[in-house]
Amino acid sequence: MARRPRHSIYSSDEDDEDFEMCDHDYDGLLPKSGKRHLGKTRWTREEDEKLKKLVEQNGTDDWKVIANYLPNRTDVQCQHRWQKVLNPELIKGPWTKEEDQRVIELVQKYGPKRWSVIAKHLKGRIGKQCRERWHNHLNPEVKKTSWTEEEDRIIYQAHKRLGNRWAEIAKLLPGRTDNAIKNHWNSTMRRKVEQEGYLQESSKASQPAVATSFQKNSHLMGFAQAPPTAQLPATGQPTVNNDYSYYHISEAQNVSSHVPYPVALHVNIVNVPQPAAAAIQRHYNDEDPEKEKRIKELELLLMSTENELKGQQVLPTQNHTCSYPGWHSTTIADHTRPHGDSAPVSCLGEHHSTPSLPADPGSLPEESASPARCMIVHQGTILDNVKNLLEFAETLQFIDSFLNTSSNHENSDLEMPSLTSTPLIGHKLTVTTPFHRDQTVKTQKENTVFRTPAIKRSILESSPRTPTPFKHALAAQEIKYGPLKMLPQTPSHLVEDLQDVIKQESDESGIVAEFQENGPPLLKKIKQEVESPTDKSGNFFCSHHWEGDSLNTQLFTQTSPVADAPNILTSSVLMAPASEDEDNVLKAFTVPKNRSLASPLQPCSSTWEPASCGKMEEQMTSSSQARKYVNAFSARTLVM
């Protein structure tokens, strides 16, 4: 069963048994004929009479049987109609003192919500009656005094704005219930307002000049911690509490004569304490009720901006100028300067502190120290930039859009280098406000040590890359013969000298190199004098090392390790450009030529060759069996 939402702590419109139980109100909607209608329609006189007869005949034990005789009602509806309206045992008269005392005791025991349980202890009363009796009469928080003119004015203004939403109006008047406000309006106030003009002339005449000038000056409230000698104007200065005084700035040109330094300008909607904010909002809404919607929108916008600023990191304390429109000329008042001097501006920011703030924590309220709620600015320049509330709203919208669109790009430029090969460990972007490039130094980044230095791709691609086999071969070569030596460069005939050296080395080692006149050298051909007929698929550079001009040269090493084996690269020439500017300048690295082996290779004996080459009878038999076994399977595609 649907419940009505709670509107007020004094509302009489909520109960877990709440249902439309109007006593014999037969003027409502009639159920449609021809189908079973289960909606909330008023009971007719005929239905009530029929329900009474059915209860007399069948009792109150089985409501489903009774509901079968009422085509448009459910068993729950029949039960509620009987228990709350038609039951002759119900007491509908006034409450006695004993009943009131019993309700008070039960509320203290069960609380002001379990009205069904409370009603079981009161014969003849239902939960709705107990609830209304408590909220309208027995609750000690309910005011029973006569209505004051201030309460009438609040009801009048709220009714103009909200209409007959009594639960909402009751929230503005603590101690008054929605039912009491409704009865007071219908019985007394409506006639006085509509016929006698009650509160209409007095409300316009009683509005102070502060409210009018307040609307002209864009909802700005000034707060100041004045020096002992400074005195605030006595007129138009309502005191909110005993600690801080809030006053209204009437005209921008008279600020310097009234306001001491420094001045904290607060946005009224969020930062002014609740009594002052309610009074200001009430004056603001007197002339234009539509402006309340804009005020609420600005509240949400301010709160969303503040939430986004909550995650901002601590920025370096620097004097810098804000780039936001409307704040570009504001300045911080310095305690060490005269009244006319000013320091550079401070932006809105989380944990952003300046040395010009007072050291005494009691000199400023919590709201003035709260981030994104106030700006500590000089007294003369802020009013020249912030003219009205709509301009301030546009500024906040600009900030909101700037945060959503520009922060990612700014942060990526500042936090991430353009070329990195190592991922950042544990890096987390917590800043949502835009950075200025002059504020964050790259040397101060927390993840600098985890970054690979950015290298230009053109430099990487200009030099030749050594394949992996050459790397292994070079490593073995350095172990045996030591590091490679670079030939000295002659300043005038470098290319000619290198060509002579390379030609001489190529004649000895069998490597032929060709050069281009206007380009980098390219290794064109490696001439192999002796090619092994038995090794076609092995790793040429890593495992087999050979050279020689005759058949007496040993081609394979049998017992010596790789480090002791000869290598083809012992007489090779590596060439690379010396710089990007000189394409024809070469670097040549040479290694002395290998010494020939002491003993030549011996031919294999006739008994050794069949055993070593797999020509024995057992070996050939096993090989043929293996081939038959493999050939028995059909070829298939290897799925990776």
Swiss-Prot record:
Assembly mode: Binds MYBBP1A. Interacts with HIPK2, MAF and NLK. Binds to HIPK1.
Induction remarks: Negatively regulated by microRNA-155 (miR-155).
Region Interaction with HIPK2 and NLK, residue ranges: 90-193
Description of post-translational modifications: Ubiquitinated; mediated by SIAH1 and leading to its subsequent proteasomal degradation.
Record-linked SMART domains: SANT
Major localization listed first in the record, in broad terms: nucleus
SUPFAM superfamilies: Homeodomain-like
Top-level taxon of the source organism: Eukaryota
Cross-link type Glycyl lysine isopeptide (Lys-Gly) (interchain with G-Cter in SUMO2), residue numbers: 480
Gene name of this polypeptide: MYB
One BP annotation, GO: erythrocyte differentiation
Any Pfam family: LMSTEN
Record-listed cross-link Glycyl lysine isopeptide (Lys-Gly) (interchain with G-Cter in SUMO1), residues: 503, 527
Region named Leucine-zipper: 376-397
DNA-binding region: 63-86, 115-138, 166-189
Annotated organism of origin: Homo sapiens
Region described as Negative regulatory domain: spans on this chain: 328-465
Residues covered by region (Transcription activation domain (PubMed:2189102)): 275-327
UniProt-listed InterPro entries: C-myb_C, Homeodomain-like_sf, Myb_dom, MYB_TF, SANT/Myb, Tscrpt_reg_Wos2-domain
GO molecular function: DNA-binding transcription activator activity, RNA polymerase II-specific; DNA-binding transcription factor activity, RNA polymerase II-specific; RNA polymerase II cis-regulatory region sequence-specific DNA binding; WD40-repeat domain binding
Residues with the Phosphothreonine modification: 534
Protein localization: Nucleus
Protein name: Transcriptional activator Myb
